[in-house]
Structures are given as structure tokens and as C-alpha cells.
Amino acid sequence: MATHHRQNAAGRRKVQVSYVIRDEVEKYNRNGVNALQLDPALNRLFTAGRDSIIRIWSVNQHKDPYIASMEHHTDWVNDIVLCCNGKTLISASSDTTVKVWNAHKGFCMSTLRTHKDYVKALAYAKDKELVASAGLDRQIFLWDVNTLTALTASNNTVTTSSLSGNKDSIYSLAMNQMGTVIVSGSTEKVLRVWDPRTCAKLMKLKGHTDNVKSLLLNRDGTQCLSGSSDGTIRLWSLGQQRCIATYRVHDEGVWALQANEAFTHVYSGGRDRKIYCTDLRSPDIHVLICEENAPVLKMELDRSADPHSAIWVSTTKSTVNKWSLKAVLGLRASGDYENDCSAPLMPLCTQTEQVIKGGASIIQCNILNDKRHILTKDTNNSVAYWDVLKACKVEDLGKTEFDEEIKRRFKMVYVPNWFSVDLKTGMLTITLDESDCFAAWVSAKDAGFTSSDGSDPKLNLGGLLLQALLEYWPRTHINPSDDESEANHTIGENSQLFLTSSSLKCADLATKKHIDAVNGEHESRMQKGNGYFQVPPHTPVIFGEAGGRTLFRLLCRDSGGETESMLLNETVPQWVIDITVDKNMPKFNKIPFYLQPHSSSGAKTLKKDRLSASDMLQVRKVMEHVYEKIINLDSESQTGASSAEKPSEQKEEEDMAVLAEEKIELLCQDQVLDPNMDLRTVKHFIWKSGGDLTLHYRQKST
């Protein structure tokens, strides 16, 4: 369909992989609501969320109004318009796309990818079934809705007209019902006006001193209302090409406007959280309808009755409220306005008529130093504990002290960063990037996984997660050839402690048993998934360019579908293919270090040889090396010990490990090291300096 215009992966910018940790059904708005649309025929309200989800609500069901969610966007949904008598919904998002939805059945029919930045605003000409979209790329595109809804897999081309001339990011857009005039508002602080039929520029209107955030046109396109961050509402005559009235009713920026059909009264809301009704014919006559508990983002008049008896209001919080306008209508009828400017206006309404309850939004997070778990705090001050690897919530901790919980869960262990976290949607979005996705290796035991043979293989967290995310993709079930497996598997080499000088021969610190265990683990990777865990099948997986443009979104469980599988073939970058399809596990990270006798030992300082080992190498292995290759060799040369009778290799190794811990101490910065620590933890928590890590050894005093 027109939805999927993708280039081959090789010709694209760097591709990242993201996924969202969430419930399968997210029933409540999890963040602010940017836009509203009411379908009076079906008594349905559509809300466009900052959590990327469009939800449908029954306005007749006060107790449980939720009907369904429309999910396809990957970032804030900034605007929506209902077209074709409520059958079609168009949405605009910060993921740079415009989407066309079947509003009755709730599925995405097609995706328009003409914008190159956030799409912030839509406008709709009801009489012509024409929609305009605009955003931060300064472009305005015109779309014929009937053409959009007719798109199919074979008929997938769509033509669009564009309106040029905007010099700054566009935040608001309006078009009259007849489709004869379109107006845009931007950070340029001016209104630009076009004729959408010819795409001709008509005029530029100056007057605002800040961003123009909301626009309305009357039916015949002769008058325009604008709301600005400068705190004013202006009424413009397009025939006279000038501002004919300015209304200063708000203390702060005006972000949302609604007007009655006759264009005699305007309802306004914004940063000051107050909603006013102003008589456009008498600038001094205005009433305070109500006061919200957060800045107002959007309003939608209930037009099912004339005059309008209610207004729906959304804010930066997740709850949507319906306020009665009956008291306003009563005032209008009686003409009994209070206009004592010296006294603050009292709101006509203090109780909402209906509430669509919202959910909590995550506003704070801390990645614990095991680089697997995250603590979060939400707008209800509730703390939760999450597992990034398994993409799930582990525990709700309730209203506990966030910082204390972080301290309580601290472990003296260092694992490199291998993912990033984003809270923009109010949910945890985890992003994996080629540059550091494979930086974190841990032992299976430390990760809480057990092997059938009792071994403790080293696991790459990023690699395991990618395999879990694409577990249902048939291409990942294909085994690589044995040759490929052998050529790319270098665990044995990477487990060694290497010297840069030949003056000291160093033993291989990976035993044959360990190598066999790791190779066995490699074989298990050739099965479906990773052999250790699965992520929830409903997890959304997103492939996107590093700059933010989404290339493809799907649910984890859907990657086995024919269409999805084909699109994955086009979209999945090579660095992900290497791990998930070819099963080429990345190499261990190495860490260089120096090993010297401690000053208190009285031993002669060695030639300063630079050693290199896996950063996961435990201190006890270095102690064994010191005991066997330095201390033991010295004592053997002094006593002339015979090596005629040798115990078994395994017994000798075990004895050596015990003797090393009994007789040797390893120090860093004069601090005695725990044999269970690995080198990366020593470097991060104890060395804490630039340059190569330096370790000192000494014999324990008897």
C-alpha cells in the first residue's frame, strides 16, 4: 500500500530498534491528550494521546466508556479529524506520518510519509472532503480523502498538492468548510493565507508577538480567529486583510479555540488552565466557564444540540472532562454578564458533567547498575520495578521513597550501558543502537538463568533481547552453516589473558569445560528465540532512523505474518541480522591492565608488561595466574621442585584456585579486592582514573 515506501536497508541512515514495555490493552490515556473529535451520530469521542494511542470512547457510558484503541503511531498524536460523516479518521503525529483510519472498525488503512518532521496540525473542509496537514518541516500538504480511502495494495499511489512559503515551523492550521481558504499559524508570528483550489498565496497577516497555536475560520472563509502564546485572541477580516478585534482574557498563552456556527462566540483555553467564553461582538463581555487542573491543549464543542450545551476539554494530564455550557447559555439569554474588571471572575462551573478517567504517566526513571532493571516513578507518585530484558513490570512498589529504593537496590557491580530509555509517551520505550547494543556481557548465573549441563556461560544481553524480539520471524529459525558458525565463534580466543610481551607466558584462563559450555550455548541459539526467555508477544517493536523517523512498527507476535515478514526483510539492519539470523554472537570486550608486586611485598618490580583480558574476568582468575605463573614459579626455581608426579589436570586446577585465594591478595588503589569482582567493576568503582588499570599483588601474611 501507499503506506510502505521504504528503501533498501543499505541505502538508509543508521537504523535503531525500539520496543515499548506496556500492558497488552492500554485502556486509559497514559499522558496528555493533544486532540479531540466527537462523532455525534454514534455518540463516540476520539482522543489523540501523547502516549501515541488514539482511543475511542462511548459518551453515553459514564461508568466504563472505553471502546477500543487505534494503535499504529510511535510518537505523540498531535491532531485528528473525522471525515466522511465519521467513517474515516485522519491523524497527524510526531513520528512524521499522517495516517488514514477506518474509524468504525478502528484499523489503519494507509500511512502518508511526505512530511520530514513532526506533523503538528490538520485542517478539514467538510464540503469538499479535503484535508490539509502541516508541521515543523514548514510544509503544508493537501489530501483528497476519497482518494486516500480508496488506496489498495495495487492502487498505492497518491498525489498531493503542497503550499509553499512558510518560513518557520507550523503549529496551527484551519480551512473553511467550503475549502476555499486555508490559514496557517507558526513561530513566524504571522498568519499566512492561501486558496487551496489554486495553491495561490493570498496574504500574510501580522499582529501577534509569539507563536500562533490555534486557528478557526468561519464557514465562508471571510473571518479568522487566532489564539497565540502571546496571550491574546485576534479576530481577522480576510477581506480587509487586517485584525479587527483583539481579546485579552487570558493571563498566559492561548492554545485552544472553539466557536459556535454563527461565529458570534469563542471558547478559549490555554496555559492558564482557564476556559472562557467571549462575545466576539463585544470584546469586553466574557465569562469564565471553568478552571482545569492543568494547561488546556484542546477543546471540542458538543454540537449535537443547538445551541451547544457542553464542551469536552483535554489537558497535559491524561483525564478528559466534559463541562456543561447551560449556565453560559442562561447568561447569554438574560444578558446578565458580570463585567467588574477589578474583581476576579468566578467560574460558572465547579463540577464536571462527565469524566473520562486517565492513567498514570511515568515521569522519572533510574537504570540500576546491573543495567537490566529500571525503577520508575509516575504521576501518582507510585514506584515500579521493571525488567528491560524480559520487557515487563516485575513489581509495583507503591508510594515509596524513590531515591531510597534506588539506594536499597544498589549492587557493587558494573555492566556497560547497552540501551537508552525514553519517557516521552509516559511509558518505557527502550532503544537499542548498533554502537553499544552488544556492550554488556554477563554470566548466565548472574542473570538468573540456568543451563541444562550446569555450566555458567557468558550471555550478551543485547543479543539475547534482539533474538527474543524477533523470535516469531521465520527467517531467524534458519540455522547458519557449520562453517559460518565456526568462522564467527571465537569465544575461546576472547576468554584468554593476553600479554603484549613474550617475557611472561600466560595460561589460558578459559577451561576446556567452559569453552564446551559456551559452544553448547551457541548451538542452542539456533533454535527459535534465545533459549532462555521470551518477551510478551504483544510488545510493540519499532525500527526507526536515528533521527526519529519510523520505518516500521509491528507487534512481536506478528513478525511471522507474510506481509510483516516481507517488510522485516526490507527494514531490519545488518547488525540485527548478524545476531538474529546468522547467530554471530559479538566478541567479548577486552580490558588492558598492568600487574605489579605491591610495594609492601618487597618483591622486585617486574618489567611493566601490558596485559589484556575479557572485562568480565574475575579477580580470582588473575590471582590464580599470579600464584601459578609468578609466585609458584619463583618458589619452584628456589626449591628445585620436581614435576615427575603430576595430579590430574582438573584436580590441579582446583587446588591452584584454593591455594591462590589462601596465599594471594590482589589490590587496586591499595584496596584489597573481592575475588568475585570482575575487572570492569574494579575499573569503574575502585580504579576510577584515566589510563590503564593497574593491579598489585602480594602474598598474605601467615
Indicate residue ranges for each PLM-predicted region:
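Conserved strand-to-loop turn within each blade of WD40 beta-propeller repeats
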Residues: 48-51, 92-95, 133-137, 145, ...
